[in-house]
Amino acid sequence: MDSDFGIPRELSPLQQLRSQYHPELPPCLQGTTVRVELGDGTTVAKAGDAHIIARAFPHTLGQPLAHFLRATAKVADAQIITEHPVKRVGIVFCGRQAPGGHNVVWGLYEALKVHNAKNTLLGFLGGSEGLFAQKTLEITDEVLQTYKNQGGYDMLGRTKDQIRTTEQVNAALKACTDLKLDSLVIIGGVTSNTDAAHLAEFFAEAKCSTKVVGVPVTINGDLKNQFVEANVGFDTTCKVNSQLISNICTDALSAEKYYYFVRLMGRKHSHVALECTLQSHPNMVILGEEVTASKLTIFDIIKQICDAVQARAEQDKNHGVILIPEGLVESIPELYALLKEIHGLLKEGVQVDNISTQLSSWSSALFEFLPPFIKKQLLLHPESDDSAQLSQIETEKLLAYLVETEMNKRLKEGTYKGKKFNAICHFFGYQARGSLPSKFDCDYAYVLGHVCYHILAAGLNGYMATVTNLKSPVNKWKCGAAPISAMMTVKRWSQNSGSTTIGRPVIHPASVDLKGKAYDLLRQNAQKFLMEDMYRNPGPVQYDGPGADAKAVSLCVEDQDYMGKIKKLQEYLDQVRTIVKPGCSQDVLKAALSVMASVTDVLTTISSSSTSGQQFA
């Protein structure tokens, strides 16, 4: 065992108090007897991707949804799992840390021990590298004692490397075989759960008995689809960020002479930025999805900000707070094109010092226009998954620099008559992702850990643990599991030659829905936020009393219970089968045929339109 992992922490009084909190379980998971109902087989979201995904997942595509129900539930096809033989389970943190991750381990450990005291849970030390090297720590009550309801991943450590290459996949197979694991639980975001799906398929093909289960844990909030409502860590991250942002808003209003540019960690998409805006009400937020949809250039964005600064100055307001998602650089078309060209040259082995001379004329002109600090950051080698090192690219400083340049120009020309523009820049991310998890994240992660046990007890492979109806109290949460392959989509790239390159099936990160209720709420208030300084301070994360049960605004305003609606549809179909049987009247039969024909026509049309909208990059 690595002595750096699993050692008892020294806890502050608040940490000690939090370690004593025991999360609640929804009724369906209480007790030792749980029913599992396997529904209809799943399909993929885009019909046009089906044949590609089917080739990649011959063993794990089309598996049914699983619903976990209380023992007393009267569902004809739901089975009670009565046998609980001894299990050996491995668990690994993949990807970046998110508040609440430790509670997934705790929940799984408790479920294992409740159902059979001889069960064993092994934590892999150092993430996927520990998996490949078979470095493990047996999870015990003593190990867990100072990590319950605590932030970080320091109990086991983590890695951001994938489980993707032939060598890595074979190492994972060997580890699970050598350690005689019945199940491997992978904790992470879109990339880690994509790897979990491919690993589950590889294990099935290799006739390995180890079942692979994924858990949606990421601060980015971008592992969202019809099965997954929220990610562990997102709630805490947004609450911590929102407190910091609101403190800055108060400072801006007090001094009345600074514009704060705040970049927020969250990868390519803007879920964190949107949620923090809804919680703290800064003056502006630049969402990457808006930039992409409107094809805004860097100069369009600068003009938007400068016009806002000028309009506020006309009301004698020379201060403000502007939020920027860290992925904005990948949403600005000319910067993204430059970044891809640089990454292509780095991949070809071109030395960093020679990159600027190898760029196309258009990219070279843009590169030379940029300030030196941004040039240096754009030249950084990409991450192990080929994505840009977004946390290292100081987009907020680039925007502040260009806005200041433009405002000085306007001041000199006499078109701007306000005070001299002063900018202060911040980057929030690391401050939040190691925070003590919120009550919601503690509960959610702990419940997901329990769900993982029931997935493996049901013998399911290639599934993700899911909990729905999350905006309601815990006693109304619905627990289940969905095949990860059903969450896959395929991207297509149009080449200059007119041909199309097709990517591998993956879980693509969800973008902010510009037709969704959360975004609509922002748009309704954007002008007031901009001009009226409606700053809101939610305060620190609350663990008890008023505010402790508060949840993300974006979670509460959306209507997301997809799996609940699937069950409701199944109930309607069952009722139709009960009513329309041989021997029913002609009138009943005619009405059923007419209605079903109309419904089928409508669904076929909708399905065809969604298929034609394939993802191109």
UniProtKB/Swiss-Prot annotation:
Tissue: Expressed in roots and specific parts such as the trichomes of leaves, cotyledon veins, as well as in stamen and gynoecium of flowers.
Keyword Transmembrane helix: no
Transmembrane region(s): none
Residues of the signal peptide: none
UniProt pathway: Carbohydrate degradation; glycolysis; D-glyceraldehyde 3-phosphate and glycerone phosphate from D-glucose: step 3/4
Keywords in alphabetical order: Allosteric enzyme, Cytoplasm, Glycolysis, Kinase, Magnesium, Metal-binding, Transferase
InterPro entries found in the cross-reference section: PfpB_PPi_PFK, Phosphofructokinase_dom, PKF_sf
UniProt family annotation: Belongs to the phosphofructokinase type A (PFKA) family. PPi-dependent PFK group II subfamily. Clade 'Long' sub-subfamily.
Functional note: Regulatory subunit of pyrophosphate--fructose 6-phosphate 1-phosphotransferase.
Protein name: Pyrophosphate--fructose 6-phosphate 1-phosphotransferase subunit alpha 2
Biological source species: Arabidopsis thaliana (Mouse-ear cress)
